[in-house]
Amino acid sequence: MTYSLLPHIHSPQDLHALSLDKLPVLCDEIRNKIIESLSLTGGHLASNLGGVELTVALHYVFSSPDDQFIFDVGHQSYVHKLLTGRNTEAFSNIRHDNGLSGFTTPQESNHDIFFSGHAGNALSLALGLAKGSSNSSSHILPILGDAAFSCGLTLEALNNIPADLSKFIIVLNDNQMSISENVGNIPQGISHWMYPQKISKLSQKIHSWIQNLPSFLHKKKTLSHKVDIALKSLSHPLFEQFGLHYVGPIDGHNVKKLVQALQMIKDQPQPILFHVCTVKGNGLAEAERDPIRYHGVKAHFQNTSLKKTSGNVELQTPISFPQHAGNILCRLGKKYPQLQVVTPAMSLGSCLEDFRKQFPDRFTDVGIAEGHAVTFSAGIARSGTPVCCSIYSTFLHRAMDNVFHDVCMQELPVIFAIDRAGLAFHDGRSHHGIYDLGFLCSMPNMVICQPRNALVLERLFFSSLLWKSPCAIRYPNIPANEKASNSFFPFSPILPGEAEILCQGDDLLLIALGHMCNTALTVKEHLLDYGISTTVVDPIFIKPLDRKLLQSLLTHHSKVIILEEHSIHGGLGSEFLLFLNQHNIKADVLSLGVPDMFIPHGNPETILNLIGLTSDHITQRILSHFKFSTPIPIERFFKA
């Protein structure tokens, strides 16, 4: 495609110079640029394609950064980045080394007001900005998807909007989707809030008629979209009851109408709910047909046929930890006919779709409501029913009090399947799963473990149902290096606090958590080149530790290395040092993990080099810390 307009847009001021008639052409160029770039890098595709016209219209009518846009989640901000001076090589490398973040990032641009990555906070942040702002001429525009209204935080903020708040426009991008289809009464109810029961029944009849049209009529989705807009325009929305002046619904893919509507409401003296209807994936036929698969794509998605996926993970070897976890839960579902699985909007990412299809009555997606997911799971456990709450590490932060008050304090046997435990690499600072141990370890009654491979993962899941205590099974989103057994229960259960010695040596004790055992075994080989032999231990459990085994090993090991892909504060290293202190054991301990900093996005090798967790870095840090006298590897010495 030839780009005639986009290369000349270096700021919103350049956009303002265009005539209204040129905006549809610019939108086409932006949409093509996103598809072109993400075909090389991967990233969040469907949500950005659906928001092109809306974002262009917002920047055309308002003047960022004086007028402030706050994107909820922020993964749909690619168009915003292109319009605010970031249509550079960095955009072409988005989410990779030397590329832009996939979320709004103030370090990139003063047009990004907040770091983003988690859902539901935009309205609260925007209200705070409005409260503290000394610039009475500035507009504040939180931009939310309809799924954000399943977040309690959004509803709390909605309950606190002053009726006399001016130049405050809530932009509701209603595409009836989250990552997957919306769940729960509120997002689905947005449409029902908009119009009364008679219109709702009419809508259902019309949509049913549209779906029964011949399959060769490819415009069915477009027709449904227009019907929604027409019917919603007949209604009186519930948002008026919150003191908001409702405007909409507006066709989110008609940039001229969007501009005209925004210009009309720009200086209204009360807070406004601006309701826009969009189609997720708009402009790319396959993304429109399947917005769930195209929510997030891998690089070269246009050049290879997309295989059947669970989330963004292609079902091909080697199988990842989340895929193994999903398969294991299906087998557990067959073995334990009461087992319930709960997730907060992560059914696809955490590979739970097979469980949902096999056991629909025993699967609950609560939407973007992590606190409810945890407390709901506690209620299930209290009834005597086994339950697994599957949740990303980074999103578990949002439910810390629920874990404390509703699970651990009640001593309820909820199994937490903590996905994405470790570095998130391309998704960056908001998504790294490297902080959860800091609060989980402080929770009484909590058992915490992490497998090094699929076989241990399998044993932990099967064993956890026998522990009868709250437990957390952590695992990263990386390939697991061994296949699970695929049988029901071929092993004796693991008891909490059972560690495993992987190899024995005389000079060092290296304790490595989870998948870092692979790195530890490589480091062990490197150290052999220096004549240093190492005992490598997989603790399996962070809490409780295998005290008996550790006390035995520490009788003849005084030099200890702790290796984990977690913050050095509050993780395995902290638990081990506490263990030494409690037992009055003296040892020289080198604790290696993620340093006390926010880790940026980037390729795995780059990030691991940055934080010193490659096998070469670790080897050199061990040699330096313990001041081993051999200056060069023995192997190289004899070769010389």
From Swiss-Prot:
The keyword Thylakoid does not apply. InterPro entries: Dxylulose-5-P_synthase, THDP-binding, Transketo_C/PFOR_II, Transketolase-like_Pyr-bd, Transketolase_C, Transketolase_CS. GO terms for cellular component: cytosol. GO terms for biological process: 1-deoxy-D-xylulose 5-phosphate biosynthetic process; isopentenyl diphosphate biosynthetic process, methylerythritol 4-phosphate pathway; terpenoid biosynthetic process; thiamine biosynthetic process. Binds 1 Mg(2+) ion per subunit. Gene3D superfamilies: 3.40.50.920, 3.40.50.970. It catalyses: D-glyceraldehyde 3-phosphate + pyruvate + H(+) = 1-deoxy-D-xylulose 5-phosphate + CO2. Keywords: Isoprene biosynthesis, Magnesium, Metal-binding, Thiamine biosynthesis, Thiamine pyrophosphate, Transferase. The keyword Transmembrane does not apply. Thiamine diphosphate binds at residues 75, 117-119, 147-148, 175, 370. Pathway: Metabolic intermediate biosynthesis; 1-deoxy-D-xylulose 5-phosphate biosynthesis; 1-deoxy-D-xylulose 5-phosphate from D-glyceraldehyde 3-phosphate and pyruvate: step 1/1. Its cofactor is Mg(2+); thiamine diphosphate. Its EC number is 2.2.1.7. Mg(2+) binds at residues 146, 175. GO terms for molecular function: 1-deoxy-D-xylulose-5-phosphate synthase activity; magnesium ion binding; thiamine pyrophosphate binding. Homodimer. Belongs to the transketolase family. DXPS subfamily. Catalyzes the acyloin condensation reaction between C atoms 2 and 3 of pyruvate and glyceraldehyde 3-phosphate to yield 1-deoxy-D-xylulose-5-phosphate (DXP). This is 1-deoxy-D-xylulose-5-phosphate synthase.
